[in-house]
Amino acid sequence: IIRRLPVRFTYDNNYFNDRYQGIPDAGYTAMVEKMLDGIEVRLNVDFLQHRAELAEIADKIVYTGPIDQYYDQCFGALNYRSLRFETQDFPVQDYQGNAVINDTNADVPYTRVIEHKHFAYGQADVLNLPHTVVTYEYPADWKQGDEPYYPVNDAKNGALYEQYRQKAAGERNVIFGGRLGQYRYLDMDDTLRAAIDCARKELE
């Protein structure tokens, strides 16, 4: 993991090196609510269990679930890495002084600690609260039925995904996107860029 983390000898505590970085002022929930305004949303519906019905109501489907499951794992199951989270509320104003701290120590079972209030940069009413919410992120082995978070980047899974990618290339009304649909690691900015590029291509 240390190969993915920036090492700095400055007071810059950013994880990324991008010139422009930000978080929606009212949070991601409010942003997504505005994006979905006027759009019918169905919660707790498994597309794969209702695909025939749902395919009838759309000219194009954007599928962001696991691509192998879309095809009933006809070539075999892709592997994933998973995570588990533990969240605690501490009666202190500041727990760690930063939004995210990554830990690469082999003796520590979690990989990062997230103190959520520090994402509210400059919002004194939040930062000065007398308690704080902290989440510990642990790596977890993945098995069927678990939440898949990351693709496994090795030769075996790469070759297996290529079979699914070639099969997906023959689809006329399905677009596969995201980490699971394209079976590749994507940061948020990469995901947004890919979605914008895909939308522009579809609207040409």
Task: Identify the meaning behind each predicted range.
Residues A30-E33, D37, D72, R193-R200, ...:
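A broad, structural surface signal
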Residues V45-K167:
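Mid-domain catalytic core of redox enzymes
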Residues E147-E204:
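C-terminal catalytic lobe of FAD-dependent flavoproteins
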Residues I1-K60, T64, Y71:
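Active-site/ligand-binding neighborhood in enzyme catalytic cores
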Residues R3-P6, T132-Y136, E171:
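Short hydrophobic/aromatic-rich motifs at helix boundaries and adjacent loops
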